[in-house]
Design a protein with these regions (language model features):
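Conserved active-site and cofactor/substrate-binding residues in soluble primary-metabolism enzymes
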Residues: 25-32, 56, 120, 153, ...
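Flexible glycine/acidic-rich beta-alpha junction loops that bind and position SAM and/or redox cofactors
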Residues: 12-13, 210-225, 251-263, 289-290
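Glycine-rich, proline-tolerant flexible connector loops at the mouths of alpha/beta enzymes
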Residues: 24, 178, 222-225
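Acidic/histidine-enriched ion/cofactor-binding microenvironments in catalytic or ligand-binding pockets
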Residues: 207-210, 232-245, 332-347
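N-terminal capping/small domains of soluble enzymes
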Residues: 1-97, 336-349, 353-355, 361
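Charged (often Lys/Glu-rich) extended helix/loop segments that serve as interaction or gating elements
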Residues: 249-398
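Short glycine/threonine-rich loop-to-helix capping motif typified by GTGT followed
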Residues: 183-189, 221-233, 260-271, 333-336
């Protein structure tokens, strides 16, 4: 389940060519991980990638998954510019603005799939489809008890009155209850609940949901000594799916489970010093560029390595601090390193999901690091150059 880690030597080339701080995404690992899920689920479930986890991997993932989930207008523009086939897109109803939905409908019409978050939203689709005479495929989002989606009653009403809007094809239910789930029994409970609901609709309205778009929120171990429960979680999900009375198609929608393991964040040591018997490494990156979601800073130890690694000296505990002028800018506390020095590069692992987008990347107007892809076949490839951000933090002046 857990991926193969890139060799230290491979990073040498990237460091020399692109400098630091730097994000590296191992495309081979992304494909390995996706193959791994394919292999485990086979016929029992399809795979959908939520691109919010790592929009840089949109193109790669669109080739290896069945579907791409788009949650914002920006994400839609990414897919459009990359010319991802409309048929692969699931447009999430979290896009609340009517004009956004209308814009997407005007571009792709019935070729995409859409999730519906509210009855009001359904009416935007009904109006568009009757005006344009084009059929639209929708998934009704069932709430998990928060502000998203609709309750069972609202969904039942829609199903009951489906003959009134023949241009809307209800494909199924969309359900997502939260992420980094801790217990396997949560998956089986949810799947049993969804099974019961889909079955009820079949019995009560003579209507079969053909699909269930389900976001399990599988937990990913980011840190040292964190248990990897992936194998066990997959078994539980598979067993629960095979036990369903409802026999439609299940599509698993995931983000970090696919991509967390492919990412690395590289930052270079500028200075090493001792303050009151504590060893500090000051690096050129910082907490604004690396964020493990769910991390309480300093509480967990991310998996890190140092390049070059064969230095002489004794292993000591070091605290790695970034370049931001805040005492909170601690990347790792008490990590054991052997003689780090100026020019040593600290490589953070498991930085493939959310790590680059959840930090405060505009803070202090630092530039955004470059992003590179790595694959055995093509070596390193620049995906995005370093970007200045100061322009976004100042008034436009003539």
């Amino acid at each position: 389940g857990s991926g193969d880690v890139m060799d230290l030597e491979k990073f040498e080339h990237a460091i020399t060519k692109y400098g630091t701080p730097l994000y590296v995404f191992d495309i081979d690992e992304v494909k390995r991980k996706t193959d791994y899920f394919r292999d485990r689920f086979r016929e029992s479930a399809g795979l959908c990638f939520a691109i919010k986890a790592n929009p840089f991997l949109t193109c790669t993932m669109s080739k290896v998954t069945d579907r791409i989930e788009v949650c914002s207008m920006g994400e839609f523009e990414i897919c459009r510019e990359l010319q991802i086939e409309a048929e692969k897109l699931l447009i999430s109803g979290v896009l609340k603005k009517k004009e956004d939905i209308t814009e997407i409908l005007n571009i792709y019409g019935g070729r995409c799939r859409y999730t519906v978050e509210s009855v009001e939203q359904l009416y935007s689709y009904i109006n568009w489809s009757s005006t344009h005479g084009e059929k639209i495929n929708v998934y009704l989002r069932l709430t998990s008890g928060n502000q998203f989606g609709m309750d069972e009653e609202a969904i039942e009403k829609i199903i009951a009155s489906r003959d009134q809007f023949p241009m809307i094809k209800v494909c199924g239910i969309h359900f997502f209850s939260g992420t980094q789930k801790k217990t396997a029994e949560k998956f089986s409970k949810e799947i049993a609940y969804l099974d019961k609901f889909c079955w009820k609709i079949e019995q009560k309205y003579g209507f079969t949901m053909s699909e269930l778009e389900y976001g399990p929120g599988i937990a990913v171990p980011y840190f040292k000594d964190q248990e990897d429960t992936l194998e066990a979680d997959i078994e539980v999900i598979k067993t629960a799916i095979s036990g369903m009375k409802w026999k439609g198609k299940v599509m698993l929608e995931m983000g970090r489970a696919f991509v967390a393991s492919c990412g690395y964040y590289l930052t270079c040591v500028h200075e090493c010093k001792k303050n009151n018997d504590r060893n500090y490494c000051i690096v050129d990156g910082g907490m604004h560029q690396i964020q493990y979601d769910g991390q309480i800073r300093g509480m967990y130890q991310p998996k890190c390595r140092m390049y070059p690694d064969g230095r002489e000296g004794k292993k000591e505990k070091w605290t790695i601090c970034g370049a931001l002028c805040t005492a909170n800018d601690v990347l790792v506390r008490d990590i054991e390193l052997t003689a780090p020095g100026e020019g040593s590069v600290i490589i953070f692992e498991n930085a493939g999901a959310y790590a680059m987008t959840e930090g405060m990347s505009l803070f202090l107007s630092h530039e955004l690091p470059a992003v590179v892809f790595y694959s055995e076949k093509e070596g390193f490839k620049l995906a995005r150059n370093k970007q200045e951000t100061y322009k976004w933090n100042m008034e436009d002046h003539k």
